[in-house]
A protein has these predicted regions:
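Bacterial N-terminal signal peptides that target proteins for export
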Residues: 2-14
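Bacterial N-terminal signal peptides
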Residues: 12-23
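N-terminal segments that cap or nucleate solenoid repeat domains
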Residues: 27-68, 77
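Ankyrin-repeat boundary/"N-cap" motif
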Residues: 29-35, 58-64, 91-97, 124-131, ...
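Ankyrin repeat A-helix N-terminal signature
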Residues: 35-39, 68-74, 101-107, 135-141, ...
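Conserved ankyrin/ankyrin-like repeat signature
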Residues: 44, 76-77, 109-110, 143-144, ...
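Ankyrin repeat domain, specifically the short helix-to-loop turn at the C-terminus of the second helix
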Residues: 49-54, 79-87, 112-120, 146-154, ...
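Terminal, low-structured helical/coil segments at or just beyond the last alpha-helical repeat
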Residues: 490-566
């Protein structure tokens, strides 16, 4: 959560505290004025004042009558209390003052009254030293902001938790009018928020941001270190982005994870502001600390997965933006050699993506694949684990229901394209996995038949012990048909997906070609060797499949070492 986001939390906690106090059955002794003010009862407040009741006597949580008047934006009640000596700087036990409430409401008239009565426009509102100007900027109420600025509010004060300024708060809430007011008041357009050493550290690991420093360098998986322009790009605020750039904002400044504003915009699905930033000469080849470029993220977002931990799904098509980046010089062969960290958190065993082309191939996206190839993308680049573009197109490690891909017919067109471009159908990765094994794991019979017709080897073996026994892996080398049976699975929790039509097709062709299925029954049936009823040396794959389904249903436990069939 950044400093600007914490402002929303501040509001929720504050309002919750006030409502909770309102619901209490009894109040602190002597808090009659505050009690009456909480109900908006001006008549009772006036009567109590006439009887010399203490207008500053707080309720149990420190809330005074003026707090309630300000929260309700009751100007007449506030006048009455201030005239009777109400303390305009009183803070409740959370540190909330009437000025903070007025700023949160964006009430210019109330702010004027409080400031005229002596409230300090720069007084910290809580333990993190948020200011009234930050609160007003978050609401986007420019008249309230002007009142504070005219009273001496400083636009470049940074709160102490995330190091954010009022300009960042305005940009993060998509308030271009507020952004303009602050720029005109001298707000620093290249100010930086604090630096967080581990991505999501604040929200998930409880780590506080670091104090910023002029020589701070990005670290792996870091976050923070954002400028106002980055906040605008992240939230998709084109108008604010234009004003910030015109005021001197650095277009190619780098965030804590080394993304520039363009990368942040695309990562968050904000393609309009991304297009503007390209026009503003943003570096289209700026790689972040995970080595992903803006082009990669745009390709990725076109075929974004859906899962519980993804808070949004981009509906706009980034294809026009991808074309614009390529025309602006984006390198389609920039090596990524990485797996997006979000997929790591989801537990996906996704292959390492080498380039944007491999990501497009994995999705089976023929239009995007052709576009990248037309701009010089190399179809023969392999990942640092040896995976080929063809393996990716065949769905290596694709998980149905998790990954998002194109229809089978379109995926097959991508497969054919790579074969026609000369990618070897039998080229194996560092685990010995081939394109045919990937296709068998997908269960796509048309793809399997095409690859077999093009010479894919049904008698090939992987290297065994793939993924160190993770995801249902076997210590015994597996054949392509085993991937259709479900032994060579890439699904988390070892969930088995059996493709019977694919097994039948591959078994038939293997029989026609005299290829023996040699995988042991122990491997095929996973920890059920003592109950063996099928001889793997004479049984067909289909017979073994039926026995295996009978023995273990649709769940296999990963074999972890050296078991022999008894």
């Amino acid at each position: 959560m950044n400093g600007a986001g914490r402002g929303s939390l501040w509001r929720v906690l504050l309002c919750g505290a006030l409502v909770a106090v309102a619901a209490l059955p009894a109040y602190a002794a002597g808090s009659e004025v505050a009690d009456a003010a909480s109900k908006g009862d001006r008549t009772s407040v006036r009567s109590l004042i006439q009887r010399k009741a203490d207008v500053n006597a707080p309720q149990v949580d420190g809330t005074t009558a003026l707090h309630w008047a300000t929260r309700a934006d009751d100007l007449d009640l506030a006048d009455m209390l201030i005239a009777a000596g109400a303390n305009v700087s009183a803070a409740n036990r959370e540190g909330v003052t009437p000025l903070g409430l007025a700023a949160m409401n964006g009430s210019a008239p109330m702010l004027q009254k409080l400031l005229k009565a002596g409230a300090d426009p720069n007084a910290p509102l809580d333990q993190f030293k948020d200011t009234a100007l930050m609160m007003a900027s978050r609401t986007g109420k420019t008249d309230a902001m002007r009142v504070l600025l005219e009273a001496g509010a400083q636009p470049n004060i940074a709160e102490t938790w995330g190091g954010t300024t009022a300009l960042m708060w305005a940009a993060s809430e998509r308030h271009p009018e507020a952004v303009k007011v602050l720029i005109d008041a001298g707000a620093e357009v290249n100010a930086r928020s604090k630096f967080v050493a581990a991505a999501n550290g604040r929200g998930f690991e409880g780590r506080s941001p670091k104090a910023d420093a002029s020589d701070q360098k990005p670290e792996d998986f870091a976050s923070g270190w954002l400028t106002p322009l980055m906040f605008a790009a992240r939230e998709g605020d084109v108008e604010s982005a234009r004003m910030l750039v015109a005021a001197g904002a650095e277009v190619n400044a780098l965030a804590g994870d080394a993304k520039n504003a363009l990368g942040l915009a695309i990562f968050n699905g904000n393609y309009e502001v991304a297009s503007y930033l390209i026009d503003a000469k943003a570096n289209v080849n700026q790689a972040d600390t995970q080595r992903f470029t803006p082009l990669y993220w745009a390709v990725d977002r076109r075929n974004m997965e859906t899962a519980p931990n993804f808070p949004w799904v981009v509906t706009a098509d980034p294809l026009p933006l991808i074309k614009k980046m390529l025309d602006a010089g984006a390198d389609p062969n920039a090596l990524v050699q990485n797996t997006p960290r979000a997929r790591m958190r989801e537990g996906s065993p996704r292959i390492v993506f080498a380039t944007p082309l491999m990501r497009a191939a994995f999705a089976g996206d023929i239009e995007l694949t052709k576009l990248l190839l037309s701009h010089g993308a190399d179809p023969k680049i392999i990942s640092n684990d040896g995976e080929t573009m063809l393996e990716a197109a065949c769905g290596l490690a694709f998980i149905q229901g998790y990954h998002r891909g194109r229809p089978a017919a379109e995926r097959l067109e991508v497969v054919k394209l790579f074969v026609e471009l000369g990618v070897d159908v039998n080229q194996a990765d560092d685990y010995g996995i081939t394109a045919l094994m990937a296709a068998a794991n997908m269960g796509d019979t048309k793809m399997i038949q095409y690859l077999v017709d093009k010479g894919a080897n049904l008698a090939a073996y992987d290297l065994g012990k793939k993924n160190d026994g993770a995801f249902g892996a076997s210590v015994e080398p597996l054949m392509p048909v085993d991937y259709a049976i479900g032994v060579g699975t890439f699904v988390p929790n070892n969930a088995v997906i059996i493709h019977e039509d694919a097994v039948a097709l591959m078994a038939r062709v293997m029989k026609e070609r005299g290829i023996t299925h040699t995988t042991s029954e122990c491997t095929l049936r996973g920890f059920t060797c003592a109950q063996a009823r099928v001889d793997p040396k004479v049984a067909s794959p289909a017979e073994i499949l039926r026995a295996r389904k009978l023995a273990i249903g649709h769940q296999i436990e990963g074999v972890t070492g050296g078991l022999e069939a008894k």
